[in-house]
Amino acid sequence: MIYNYPRFPGGKTKAVTLSYDDGTVHDIRFAEILNAYGLKCTFNLVGYRVANEECLTHAFIRENILGKGHEIANHGYFHRAMDTLRPIEAIRDTLDSRLTLEKTFGIIVRGMAFPDRTVNRHQKPELYKAVKSYLEDLDIAYTRCSGGIENDTFMLPEDFHNWEVTAHHNNPRLMEYADKFLEIDVDAQYRSRRMPRVFFMYGHSFEFDRDQNWDYLEAVCQKLAGREEIWYATNMEIYNYIHAYQSLVYSADGLLVYNPTLYEIWFDVDGILYHIKPGETITLRDEVHF
């Protein structure tokens, strides 16, 4: 075995995911559009707004967000920038928000987008290290970064607590990035570059209302939707699937593979596509296809 790469469910080589913040009333129209096109989004909600049903009702979130396969994630209880807080304040803000979301909707919430400003490992490495440590203690599985960092390579993150987006929807190059993403033939890449790709757009739904460009959102959805090679997933669905892939157990020679997870997992080994069911052990072919 020379190269082993994950493939998304069904053997797909690409995924599209969205991440939108704050839980404002504009999420109602936003969710309607996404649902019409079959795109999936992670809605990052502010705890105190949820507790007080300030913008969205609990019924709407249950029926039109969670009920349509989207994710809700943590965006702080008071939407406070974590780089301005003492650790104890940031921990409480994060935990209070998580507890509110979980108790209100009866689900486990392990995803997060940094509120107000990103804590990025490249820009603020020491602060990021400290923040990541207590987020892990709080069982936050991933955190989305934003704010000037673009990932137009579409690669999966090496560190899910520093998950960099492709672009904000207002980025003037967004459609260019979308075309670039769609044109990539992953399996035709050089063998050391056949990693799966993810197109990751973020923003705030109120920006479409403010800028009067809901038609632009529809144009983006039309471009990305309905493609056989793409898995439309939430942030947490991608995290969980990749975590399951990373949990596969191999024999010393790499030819026996055991799946201890509850996921059916697809992966490419030296040009051959495999899938393995939960609890299954399979034998890989001892050959290489370039």
Residue ranges and their predicted role:
Residues 15-17, 40-42, 69-73, 109-111, ...:
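Structural preference for beta-strand elements that scaffold enzyme active sites
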Residues 23-25, 48-50, 77-80, 116-120, ...:
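Short, solvent-exposed loop/turn segments at secondary-structure junctions
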Residues 29-33, 130, 216, 220:
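A short acidic, amphipathic alpha-helical/loop segment
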Residues 59-62, 181-190:
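Histidine/acidic residue-rich metal-binding segments in metalloenzymes
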Residues 2-10, 38, 52, 142-154, ...:
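C-terminal domain-boundary segment and adjacent tail
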Residues 1-71, 78-81, 93, 99-119, ...:
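Active-site beta->alpha N-cap acidic-glycine motif
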Residues 272-290:
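Tight coil/turn sites that cap or link beta-strands
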Residues 81-183, 212-216:
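Catalytic domains of cell-wall/extracellular-matrix polysaccharide-remodeling enzymes
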